[in-house]
Protein backbone atom coordinates (compact mmCIF):
# COMPACT_ATOMS: atom_id res chain seq x y z
CA UNK A 1 0.00 0.00 0.00
CA UNK A 2 1.28 3.44 -0.95
CA UNK A 3 0.92 5.94 1.86
CA UNK A 4 -0.91 9.08 0.75
CA UNK A 5 0.22 12.38 2.25
CA UNK A 6 -2.38 14.15 4.35
CA UNK A 7 -4.74 16.54 2.59
CA UNK A 8 -3.22 19.37 4.59
CA UNK A 9 0.25 18.43 3.35
CA UNK A 10 -0.90 18.28 -0.29
CA UNK A 11 -2.50 21.70 -0.05
CA UNK A 12 0.61 23.15 1.55
CA UNK A 13 2.92 21.64 -1.08
CA UNK A 14 0.88 22.92 -4.01
CA UNK A 15 0.36 26.39 -2.58
CA UNK A 16 4.04 26.65 -1.70
CA UNK A 17 4.96 25.84 -5.30
CA UNK A 18 2.73 28.67 -6.45
CA UNK A 19 4.44 31.04 -4.02
CA UNK A 20 7.89 30.23 -5.40
CA UNK A 21 6.64 30.65 -8.95
CA UNK A 22 5.30 34.07 -8.12
CA UNK A 23 8.62 35.16 -6.68
CA UNK A 24 9.61 35.55 -10.35
CA UNK A 25 6.34 36.42 -12.06
CA UNK A 26 4.01 38.31 -9.74
CA UNK A 27 4.19 42.11 -9.57
CA UNK A 28 3.94 43.76 -6.16
CA UNK A 29 0.47 44.32 -4.75
CA UNK A 30 -0.86 47.84 -4.44
CA UNK A 31 -0.49 49.66 -1.13
CA UNK A 32 -4.24 49.26 -0.58
CA UNK A 33 -3.98 45.49 -1.07
CA UNK A 34 -0.87 45.14 1.10
CA UNK A 35 -2.50 46.92 4.05
CA UNK A 36 -5.61 44.77 3.68
CA UNK A 37 -3.62 41.54 3.43
CA UNK A 38 -1.51 42.44 6.44
CA UNK A 39 -4.58 43.22 8.48
CA UNK A 40 -6.31 40.02 7.44
CA UNK A 41 -3.30 37.90 8.35
CA UNK A 42 -3.63 38.98 11.99
CA UNK A 43 -7.28 38.16 12.64
CA UNK A 44 -9.19 34.92 12.89
CA UNK A 45 -12.61 36.05 11.79
CA UNK A 46 -14.31 33.06 10.15
CA UNK A 47 -17.38 34.23 8.29
CA UNK A 48 -19.87 31.47 7.63
CA UNK A 49 -20.05 30.29 4.05
CA UNK A 50 -23.46 30.23 2.32
CA UNK A 51 -25.56 27.40 3.73
CA UNK A 52 -26.71 25.21 0.85
CA UNK A 53 -27.02 21.63 2.12
CA UNK A 54 -26.68 20.04 -1.32
CA UNK A 55 -23.32 21.69 -1.97
CA UNK A 56 -19.88 21.26 -0.45
CA UNK A 57 -18.03 24.31 0.75
CA UNK A 58 -15.71 26.00 -1.69
CA UNK A 59 -12.75 25.29 0.60
CA UNK A 60 -13.44 21.56 0.36
CA UNK A 61 -13.86 21.84 -3.40
CA UNK A 62 -10.52 23.62 -3.70
CA UNK A 63 -8.83 21.00 -1.56
CA UNK A 64 -10.32 18.22 -3.69
CA UNK A 65 -9.11 19.96 -6.81
CA UNK A 66 -5.58 20.04 -5.45
CA UNK A 67 -5.65 16.31 -4.77
CA UNK A 68 -7.15 15.44 -8.15
CA UNK A 69 -4.89 17.47 -10.37
CA UNK A 70 -1.68 19.38 -10.63
CA UNK A 71 -1.78 23.16 -10.44
CA UNK A 72 -0.98 25.06 -13.64
CA UNK A 73 1.57 27.72 -12.72
CA UNK A 74 0.85 31.11 -14.32
CA UNK A 75 3.17 32.77 -16.76
CA UNK A 76 2.71 36.35 -17.85
CA UNK A 77 4.89 35.63 -20.86
CA UNK A 78 2.12 33.37 -22.24
CA UNK A 79 0.12 36.44 -23.24
CA UNK A 80 0.05 37.52 -26.86
CA UNK A 81 -1.45 40.61 -28.45
CA UNK A 82 -4.78 38.95 -29.25
CA UNK A 83 -5.98 35.72 -27.60
CA UNK A 84 -9.08 33.95 -28.98
CA UNK A 85 -11.75 32.17 -26.94
CA UNK A 86 -15.21 30.76 -27.50
CA UNK A 87 -17.93 28.23 -26.70
CA UNK A 88 -21.27 27.08 -28.07
CA UNK A 89 -23.95 24.89 -26.51
CA UNK A 90 -27.59 23.87 -26.60
CA UNK A 91 -29.94 24.71 -23.74
CA UNK A 92 -30.74 21.90 -21.35
CA UNK A 93 -32.04 23.12 -18.00
CA UNK A 94 -33.00 20.17 -15.84
CA UNK A 95 -33.01 16.48 -16.73
CA UNK A 96 -34.03 15.02 -20.08
CA UNK A 97 -36.75 12.42 -19.69
CA UNK A 98 -35.75 8.96 -20.85
CA UNK A 99 -39.13 8.65 -22.57
CA UNK A 100 -38.86 11.87 -24.53
CA UNK A 101 -35.52 13.34 -25.51
CA UNK A 102 -37.07 16.76 -26.04
CA UNK A 103 -38.88 16.83 -22.72
CA UNK A 104 -37.21 18.84 -19.99
CA UNK A 105 -38.25 17.80 -16.51
CA UNK A 106 -37.26 18.87 -13.01
CA UNK A 107 -36.94 16.87 -9.83
CA UNK A 108 -38.81 17.97 -6.73
CA UNK A 109 -35.72 19.42 -5.11
CA UNK A 110 -35.48 21.91 -7.99
CA UNK A 111 -39.14 22.82 -7.58
CA UNK A 112 -38.64 23.27 -3.84
CA UNK A 113 -35.65 25.54 -4.46
CA UNK A 114 -37.82 27.73 -6.69
CA UNK A 115 -40.71 27.72 -4.22
CA UNK A 116 -38.48 28.55 -1.26
CA UNK A 117 -36.46 31.30 -2.97
CA UNK A 118 -37.03 34.17 -0.48
CA UNK A 119 -36.91 36.81 -3.20
CA UNK A 120 -38.60 35.14 -6.16
CA UNK A 121 -41.78 33.80 -4.60
CA UNK A 122 -42.81 36.85 -2.51
CA UNK A 123 -42.26 39.20 -5.48
CA UNK A 124 -44.35 37.02 -7.80
CA UNK A 125 -47.07 36.86 -5.14
CA UNK A 126 -47.04 40.64 -4.82
CA UNK A 127 -47.27 41.07 -8.60
CA UNK A 128 -50.24 38.67 -8.79
CA UNK A 129 -52.08 40.48 -6.00
CA UNK A 130 -51.46 43.84 -7.67
CA UNK A 131 -52.80 42.56 -10.98
CA UNK A 132 -55.93 41.02 -9.44
CA UNK A 133 -56.83 44.51 -8.25
CA UNK A 134 -59.99 45.50 -6.37
CA UNK A 135 -62.27 43.09 -8.23
CA UNK A 136 -60.40 39.76 -8.21
CA UNK A 137 -63.53 37.65 -8.71
CA UNK A 138 -63.85 39.04 -12.23
CA UNK A 139 -60.34 37.92 -13.16
CA UNK A 140 -59.50 34.80 -15.13
CA UNK A 141 -55.86 33.83 -14.61
CA UNK A 142 -53.46 31.48 -16.41
CA UNK A 143 -50.51 29.92 -14.57
CA UNK A 144 -48.27 28.65 -17.36
CA UNK A 145 -45.95 25.93 -16.03
CA UNK A 146 -47.60 25.60 -12.63
CA UNK A 147 -45.27 22.88 -11.29
CA UNK A 148 -46.03 20.20 -8.67
CA UNK A 149 -47.18 22.68 -6.02
CA UNK A 150 -49.52 24.79 -8.23
CA UNK A 151 -47.90 27.62 -6.32
CA UNK A 152 -48.96 30.72 -8.23
CA UNK A 153 -52.32 29.23 -9.21
CA UNK A 154 -53.07 28.84 -5.51
CA UNK A 155 -51.89 32.39 -4.79
CA UNK A 156 -54.39 33.71 -7.34
CA UNK A 157 -57.20 31.51 -6.02
CA UNK A 158 -56.52 32.37 -2.39
CA UNK A 159 -56.64 36.06 -3.29
CA UNK A 160 -60.06 35.71 -4.84
CA UNK A 161 -59.54 35.06 -8.57
CA UNK A 162 -62.76 33.91 -10.21
CA UNK A 163 -61.08 31.21 -12.30
CA UNK A 164 -57.53 29.90 -12.69
CA UNK A 165 -56.19 27.62 -15.41
CA UNK A 166 -52.86 25.98 -14.59
CA UNK A 167 -50.97 24.32 -17.44
CA UNK A 168 -48.29 21.72 -16.69
CA UNK A 169 -46.50 19.52 -19.27
CA UNK A 170 -44.91 17.08 -16.83
CA UNK A 171 -47.50 14.37 -16.02
CA UNK A 172 -46.03 13.65 -12.58
CA UNK A 173 -45.95 17.34 -11.68
CA UNK A 174 -49.49 17.81 -13.02
CA UNK A 175 -50.82 15.03 -10.77
CA UNK A 176 -49.01 16.50 -7.78
CA UNK A 177 -50.53 19.91 -8.60
CA UNK A 178 -54.03 18.37 -8.63
CA UNK A 179 -53.37 16.87 -5.21
CA UNK A 180 -52.23 20.21 -3.80
CA UNK A 181 -55.25 22.00 -5.25
CA UNK A 182 -57.64 19.41 -3.83
CA UNK A 183 -56.03 19.50 -0.38
CA UNK A 184 -56.24 23.30 -0.43
CA UNK A 185 -59.95 23.18 -1.29
CA UNK A 186 -59.74 25.17 -4.54
CA UNK A 187 -60.62 22.44 -7.04
CA UNK A 188 -63.71 24.43 -8.10
CA UNK A 189 -61.55 27.49 -8.92
CA UNK A 190 -58.37 25.92 -10.33
CA UNK A 191 -58.34 23.61 -13.33
CA UNK A 192 -55.09 21.74 -14.00
CA UNK A 193 -54.53 21.39 -17.75
CA UNK A 194 -52.00 18.66 -18.50
CA UNK A 195 -49.87 19.00 -21.63
CA UNK A 196 -47.63 21.42 -23.47
CA UNK A 197 -49.14 24.88 -23.61
CA UNK A 198 -48.59 24.86 -27.38
CA UNK A 199 -50.80 21.76 -27.70
CA UNK A 200 -53.73 22.49 -25.38
CA UNK A 201 -56.81 24.72 -25.56
CA UNK A 202 -58.60 26.76 -22.90
CA UNK A 203 -62.39 27.21 -22.82
CA UNK A 204 -62.12 30.99 -22.40
CA UNK A 205 -59.69 33.89 -22.68
CA UNK A 206 -57.72 34.93 -19.61
CA UNK A 207 -57.03 38.39 -18.21
CA UNK A 208 -53.39 37.80 -17.39
CA UNK A 209 -50.78 35.06 -17.50
CA UNK A 210 -48.18 34.17 -14.87
CA UNK A 211 -45.29 32.49 -16.70
CA UNK A 212 -42.29 31.66 -14.55
CA UNK A 213 -40.56 29.76 -17.34
CA UNK A 214 -37.31 31.64 -17.01
CA UNK A 215 -33.95 29.89 -17.14
CA UNK A 216 -30.58 30.93 -15.80
CA UNK A 217 -30.10 32.25 -19.30
CA UNK A 218 -33.52 33.83 -19.51
CA UNK A 219 -34.60 32.18 -22.77
CA UNK A 220 -33.21 28.69 -22.19
CA UNK A 221 -36.48 27.13 -20.97
CA UNK A 222 -38.13 28.02 -24.28
CA UNK A 223 -39.81 31.25 -23.16
CA UNK A 224 -39.68 32.83 -26.62
CA UNK A 225 -41.62 30.09 -28.43
CA UNK A 226 -43.90 29.44 -25.46
CA UNK A 227 -44.98 33.06 -24.93
CA UNK A 228 -45.39 33.70 -28.62
CA UNK A 229 -47.85 30.80 -28.79
CA UNK A 230 -49.51 31.75 -25.49
CA UNK A 231 -50.71 35.09 -26.90
CA UNK A 232 -53.78 33.17 -28.13
CA UNK A 233 -54.90 32.60 -24.52
CA UNK A 234 -55.05 36.31 -23.57
CA UNK A 235 -57.89 38.80 -23.97
CA UNK A 236 -55.38 41.60 -24.58
CA UNK A 237 -52.00 39.96 -25.18
CA UNK A 238 -50.25 43.17 -26.28
CA UNK A 239 -50.93 44.90 -22.96
CA UNK A 240 -47.79 44.76 -20.77
CA UNK A 241 -49.85 44.07 -17.63
CA UNK A 242 -51.29 40.94 -19.25
CA UNK A 243 -48.02 39.20 -18.37
CA UNK A 244 -46.11 38.40 -15.16
CA UNK A 245 -43.24 38.84 -15.78
CA UNK A 246 -43.72 41.37 -18.54
CA UNK A 247 -40.17 40.97 -19.84
CA UNK A 248 -37.13 38.82 -19.15
CA UNK A 249 -33.48 39.72 -19.64
CA UNK A 250 -30.04 38.16 -19.57
CA UNK A 251 -26.95 40.04 -18.39
CA UNK A 252 -23.37 38.96 -18.98
CA UNK A 253 -19.81 39.83 -17.98
CA UNK A 254 -16.29 38.36 -18.33
CA UNK A 255 -15.18 36.37 -15.30
CA UNK A 256 -12.36 34.61 -13.53
CA UNK A 257 -13.00 31.17 -12.00
CA UNK A 258 -10.99 29.66 -9.15
CA UNK A 259 -11.22 25.98 -10.08
CA UNK A 260 -10.24 26.68 -13.69
CA UNK A 261 -6.95 27.87 -12.21
CA UNK A 262 -6.56 24.76 -10.03
CA UNK A 263 -7.63 22.06 -12.47
CA UNK A 264 -5.51 21.75 -15.58
CA UNK A 265 -4.43 19.41 -18.36
CA UNK A 266 -3.37 16.68 -18.70
CA UNK A 267 -5.06 15.50 -15.47
CA UNK A 268 -8.21 17.49 -16.17
CA UNK A 269 -9.32 18.41 -19.68
CA UNK A 270 -11.84 21.26 -19.74
CA UNK A 271 -12.36 20.79 -23.48
CA UNK A 272 -14.30 17.58 -22.72
CA UNK A 273 -17.16 19.78 -21.57
CA UNK A 274 -17.55 20.57 -25.28
CA UNK A 275 -18.87 24.04 -24.53
CA UNK A 276 -21.44 22.90 -21.95
CA UNK A 277 -21.48 25.59 -19.24
CA UNK A 278 -20.68 25.21 -15.57
CA UNK A 279 -23.52 26.47 -13.36
CA UNK A 280 -22.90 28.31 -10.12
CA UNK A 281 -24.87 29.31 -7.09
CA UNK A 282 -25.11 33.10 -7.47
CA UNK A 283 -23.45 33.46 -4.05
CA UNK A 284 -20.39 31.43 -5.06
CA UNK A 285 -17.38 33.72 -4.84
CA UNK A 286 -15.20 31.27 -6.73
CA UNK A 287 -16.51 33.18 -9.75
CA UNK A 288 -15.68 36.91 -9.91
CA UNK A 289 -16.60 39.48 -12.55
CA UNK A 290 -13.87 41.38 -14.41
CA UNK A 291 -16.04 44.25 -15.65
CA UNK A 292 -19.51 45.75 -15.35
CA UNK A 293 -22.31 43.55 -16.77
CA UNK A 294 -24.15 44.40 -19.99
CA UNK A 295 -27.58 43.43 -21.33
CA UNK A 296 -27.35 40.63 -23.91
CA UNK A 297 -30.97 39.46 -24.15
CA UNK A 298 -34.29 41.26 -23.69
CA UNK A 299 -37.62 39.53 -24.41
CA UNK A 300 -40.77 41.65 -24.06
CA UNK A 301 -43.74 39.29 -23.67
CA UNK A 302 -46.39 41.77 -24.85
CA UNK A 303 -44.27 42.94 -27.79
CA UNK A 304 -42.97 39.53 -28.80
CA UNK A 305 -44.43 39.66 -32.32
CA UNK A 306 -43.42 43.13 -33.42
CA UNK A 307 -39.82 42.58 -32.31
CA UNK A 308 -39.75 38.84 -32.95
CA UNK A 309 -36.88 38.81 -35.41
CA UNK A 310 -34.65 40.77 -33.05
CA UNK A 311 -35.49 38.49 -30.16
CA UNK A 312 -35.20 35.21 -32.06
CA UNK A 313 -31.66 35.91 -33.20
CA UNK A 314 -30.12 38.05 -30.51
CA UNK A 315 -26.78 38.73 -32.20
CA UNK A 316 -24.64 41.30 -30.45
CA UNK A 317 -21.05 42.47 -30.70
CA UNK A 318 -19.84 43.56 -27.29
CA UNK A 319 -16.67 45.15 -25.94
CA UNK A 320 -15.82 44.79 -22.25
CA UNK A 321 -12.98 46.67 -20.58
CA UNK A 322 -11.26 44.81 -17.75
CA UNK A 323 -11.70 46.88 -14.59
CA UNK A 324 -8.54 47.24 -12.51
CA UNK A 325 -10.53 48.16 -9.40
CA UNK A 326 -12.53 44.95 -9.75
CA UNK A 327 -9.35 42.89 -10.18
CA UNK A 328 -7.88 44.39 -7.02
CA UNK A 329 -11.07 43.83 -5.04
CA UNK A 330 -11.35 40.27 -6.37
CA UNK A 331 -7.76 39.62 -5.28
CA UNK A 332 -8.61 40.75 -1.75
CA UNK A 333 -11.82 38.70 -1.63
CA UNK A 334 -10.07 35.56 -2.86
CA UNK A 335 -7.21 36.09 -0.44
CA UNK A 336 -9.75 36.32 2.37
CA UNK A 337 -11.26 33.01 1.28
CA UNK A 338 -7.91 31.22 1.08
CA UNK A 339 -6.89 32.58 4.48
CA UNK A 340 -9.91 30.98 6.11
CA UNK A 341 -7.67 27.96 6.44
CA UNK A 342 -5.03 28.94 9.02
CA UNK A 343 -2.68 26.32 7.64
CA UNK A 344 -1.99 28.39 4.51
CA UNK A 345 0.39 31.29 4.87
CA UNK A 346 -0.16 34.84 3.71
CA UNK A 347 2.32 34.31 0.88
CA UNK A 348 0.63 31.12 -0.30
CA UNK A 349 -2.83 32.65 -0.24
CA UNK A 350 -1.62 35.83 -1.91
CA UNK A 351 -0.13 33.85 -4.80
CA UNK A 352 -3.25 31.85 -5.60
CA UNK A 353 -5.54 34.86 -5.14
CA UNK A 354 -3.44 36.93 -7.52
CA UNK A 355 -3.32 34.15 -10.12
CA UNK A 356 -7.09 33.71 -10.15
CA UNK A 357 -8.11 37.37 -9.96
CA UNK A 358 -5.87 38.31 -12.90
CA UNK A 359 -7.24 35.57 -15.20
CA UNK A 360 -10.11 35.11 -17.65
CA UNK A 361 -12.20 31.94 -17.97
CA UNK A 362 -15.29 32.95 -19.95
CA UNK A 363 -18.41 35.09 -20.22
CA UNK A 364 -20.90 34.46 -17.40
CA UNK A 365 -24.65 35.05 -17.78
CA UNK A 366 -27.63 35.32 -15.42
CA UNK A 367 -31.30 36.42 -15.61
CA UNK A 368 -33.27 39.51 -14.62
CA UNK A 369 -37.08 39.57 -14.55
CA UNK A 370 -39.21 42.71 -14.93
CA UNK A 371 -42.41 41.61 -13.18
CA UNK A 372 -44.32 44.91 -13.24
CA UNK A 373 -43.57 48.63 -13.51
CA UNK A 374 -42.35 48.64 -9.91
CA UNK A 375 -41.30 45.04 -9.21
CA UNK A 376 -37.99 43.68 -10.54
CA UNK A 377 -36.38 40.37 -9.67
CA UNK A 378 -32.58 40.08 -9.88
CA UNK A 379 -30.60 36.86 -9.55
CA UNK A 380 -27.41 38.90 -9.02
CA UNK A 381 -27.37 42.50 -7.83
CA UNK A 382 -28.23 45.15 -10.39
CA UNK A 383 -26.39 46.85 -12.01
CA UNK A 384 -23.06 45.64 -10.56
CA UNK A 385 -23.65 41.87 -10.77
CA UNK A 386 -22.47 41.19 -7.23
CA UNK A 387 -23.17 37.91 -5.44
CA UNK A 388 -26.52 37.31 -3.76
CA UNK A 389 -28.82 34.42 -2.91
CA UNK A 390 -31.04 33.12 -5.72
CA UNK A 391 -32.37 29.77 -6.93
CA UNK A 392 -31.30 30.83 -10.43
CA UNK A 393 -27.70 30.10 -11.30
CA UNK A 394 -24.86 31.93 -12.96
CA UNK A 395 -24.00 30.18 -16.23
CA UNK A 396 -20.32 30.07 -17.24
CA UNK A 397 -19.04 28.27 -20.35
CA UNK A 398 -15.33 27.45 -19.97
CA UNK A 399 -14.02 29.18 -23.08
CA UNK A 400 -10.33 28.22 -23.00
CA UNK A 401 -8.41 25.06 -22.13
CA UNK A 402 -6.40 27.07 -19.61
CA UNK A 403 -7.26 30.44 -18.07
CA UNK A 404 -5.98 33.47 -19.96
CA UNK A 405 -3.69 34.99 -17.36
CA UNK A 406 -1.73 38.17 -16.87
CA UNK A 407 -4.61 40.65 -16.90
CA UNK A 408 -3.60 44.06 -15.56
CA UNK A 409 -6.70 46.13 -16.23
CA UNK A 410 -7.95 48.04 -19.30
CA UNK A 411 -7.63 45.04 -21.64
CA UNK A 412 -10.39 44.91 -24.26
CA UNK A 413 -12.51 41.75 -24.37
CA UNK A 414 -14.39 41.67 -27.69
CA UNK A 415 -17.25 39.18 -27.84
CA UNK A 416 -19.75 38.15 -30.50
CA UNK A 417 -22.91 36.78 -28.85
CA UNK A 418 -25.42 34.75 -30.86
CA UNK A 419 -28.60 33.47 -29.17
CA UNK A 420 -30.72 31.37 -31.55
CA UNK A 421 -34.30 30.97 -30.27
CA UNK A 422 -36.45 28.49 -32.25
CA UNK A 423 -40.13 29.00 -33.04
CA UNK A 424 -40.82 25.41 -31.94
CA UNK A 425 -40.88 24.87 -28.17
CA UNK A 426 -39.68 21.29 -28.74
CA UNK A 427 -36.39 22.53 -30.19
CA UNK A 428 -33.79 23.72 -27.69
CA UNK A 429 -32.36 27.24 -27.95
CA UNK A 430 -28.71 27.42 -28.98
CA UNK A 431 -26.06 29.80 -27.74
CA UNK A 432 -22.69 30.85 -29.12
CA UNK A 433 -20.09 33.23 -27.70
CA UNK A 434 -16.69 33.83 -29.25
CA UNK A 435 -14.15 36.60 -29.24
CA UNK A 436 -10.66 37.78 -28.38
CA UNK A 437 -8.83 39.47 -25.54
CA UNK A 438 -6.53 42.26 -26.66
CA UNK A 439 -3.67 42.23 -24.17
Regions found by a protein language model. Name each.
Residues 21-25, 77-82:
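Boundary at the C-terminal end of the N-terminal hydrophobic targeting segment
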Residues 1-34, 39-47:
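N-terminal chloroplast transit peptides
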Residues 20, 72-76, 371:
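Hydrophobic membrane-targeting signal helices
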Residues 60-80:
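N-terminal export signals
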Residues 47-67:
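N-terminal secretory signal peptides and thylakoid transit peptides that target proteins
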Residues 9-10, 46-51, 106-110:
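General secondary-structure propensity
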Residues 83-144, 149-418, 422-438:
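Class I SAM-binding transferase module
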Amino acid sequence: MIAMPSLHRLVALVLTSVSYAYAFTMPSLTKKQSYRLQALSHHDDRKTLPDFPTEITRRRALATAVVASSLVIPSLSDATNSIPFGASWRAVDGLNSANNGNFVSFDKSAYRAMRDDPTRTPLFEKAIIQRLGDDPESRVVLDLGTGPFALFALVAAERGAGKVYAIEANPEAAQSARDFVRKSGYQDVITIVEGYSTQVELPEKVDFCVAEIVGSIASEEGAYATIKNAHRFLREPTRPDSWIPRRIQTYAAPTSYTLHNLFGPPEFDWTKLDGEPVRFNCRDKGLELLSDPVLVEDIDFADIFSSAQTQRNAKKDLVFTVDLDRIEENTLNLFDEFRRDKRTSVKESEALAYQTAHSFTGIASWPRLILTDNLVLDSRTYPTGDHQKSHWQTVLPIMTERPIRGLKGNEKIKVSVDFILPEDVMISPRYRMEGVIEM
